[in-house]
């Protein structure tokens, strides 16, 4: 399950950025951990089976996720092309409410996250229904560890991001990566284990 979290996505890119800036890292890590816990619980509890039983919902998640990723890529590309207040020492800390709102956006308004965190983890957990909640707990623990490591270790990179040019490079890389992930989402049919997947609350 750690491979799902390590994959580059809008949420990880956002946590990385906040970690480098050393702004509200604990709040963001905690928020991402709680959100993932809720999504994993939904999948393990049976929501994954509900989505899997309705192919149209999966289709919406695929194309909606790709659209979200492309939109995020365009925002990153804009920041890379026309940087504004990228260096923490120059721009000052962002408002907490704005940071929290952005964290919620990249977490819950990205349809692709529901394919990974809800559908895939939920389906895998229900392969062994008696142990599904232990599986979910393990997946959640891995998620929390990943966000903590990413957020708190990213601060060590701050010296490398002391100039706007470094942030422009990061945003450019994020933009290219998001486009690549969007293409993969569009051309790859989601493969979800189906055996023993049932609505078990």
UniProtKB/Swiss-Prot annotation:
Membrane-topology descriptor: Multi-pass membrane protein
Any one GO biological process: amino acid transport
Domain of life assignment: Bacteria
Cellular localisation: Cell membrane
Keyword Cell membrane annotated: yes
GO molecular function annotations of the record: amino acid transmembrane transporter activity
Main location: membrane
Membrane found in the keyword field: yes
Residue spans crossing the bilayer: 25-45, 57-77, 104-124, 133-153, 169-189
Keywords, alphabetical: Amino-acid transport, Cell membrane, Membrane, Transmembrane, Transmembrane helix, Transport
Matches recorded under Pfam families: LysE (PF01810)
GO CC, one annotated term: plasma membrane
Family to which the UniProt record says this protein belongs: Belongs to the LysE/ArgO transporter (TC 2.A.75) family.
Protein's name according to its UniProt entry: Putative amino-acid transporter Rv0488
């Amino acid at each position: 399950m750690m491979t799902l979290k390590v994959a580059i996505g809008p949420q990880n890119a956002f946590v990385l950025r906040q970690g480098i800036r050393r702004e509200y890292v604990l709040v963001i890590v905690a928020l991402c951990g709680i959100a993932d816990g809720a999504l994993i619980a939904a999948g393990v509890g049976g929501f994954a089976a509900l989505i899997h039983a309705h192919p149209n919902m999966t289709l919406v998640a695929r194309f909606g996720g790709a659209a979200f990723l492309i939109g995020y890529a365009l925002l990153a590309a804009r920041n890379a092309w026309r940087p504004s207040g990228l260096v923490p020492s120059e721009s000052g800390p962002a408002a907490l409410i704005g940071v929290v709102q952005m964290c919620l956006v990249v977490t819950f308004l990205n349809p692709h996250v529901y394919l990974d965190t809800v559908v895939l983890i939920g389906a895998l957990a229900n392969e062994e229904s008696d142990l599904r909640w232990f599986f979910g707990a393990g997946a959640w623990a891995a998620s929390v560890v990943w966000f903590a490591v990413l957020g708190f270790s990213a601060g060590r990179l701050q010296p490398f991001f002391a100039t706007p040019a470094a942030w422009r490079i990061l945003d450019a890389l994020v933009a290219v990566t998001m486009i690549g992930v969007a293409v993969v989402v569009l051309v790859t049919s989601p493969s979800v284990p189906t055996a023993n997947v049932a609505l078990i609350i």
